[in-house]
Amino acid sequence: MTTIRVKDNEPFEVAMRRFKRTMEKTGLLTELRAREFYEKPTAERKRKKAAAVKRHFKRLRGQMLPKKFY
């Protein structure tokens, strides 16, 4: 359970922003969304493999030399 302590004279918006940041760091919302519906093991493997391929090509694209313009 994520908790934050609201400081004296702290605006609500600032406290809410801090709470959202801590929730994002823990990864609780992403896990909750993933567990909302059952996902078959084959579908999970397929999704994870596609994500790995996407990360690989993204990394390669960052290492490529720029094209020469002439």
Curated annotation (Swiss-Prot):
Keyword Ribonucleoprotein in record: yes
Biological processes per GO annotation: translation
GO molecular function list: structural constituent of ribosome
Pfam families from the UniProt entry: Ribosomal_S21
Keywords, ordered alphabetically: Ribonucleoprotein, Ribosomal protein
Record GO cellular component, one term: ribonucleoprotein complex
InterPro entries linked: Ribosomal_bS21, Ribosomal_bS21_sf
Coiled-coil zones: none
Annotated family: Belongs to the bacterial ribosomal protein bS21 family.
Protein name: Small ribosomal subunit protein bS21B
The organism of origin for this protein: Paraburkholderia xenovorans (strain LB400)
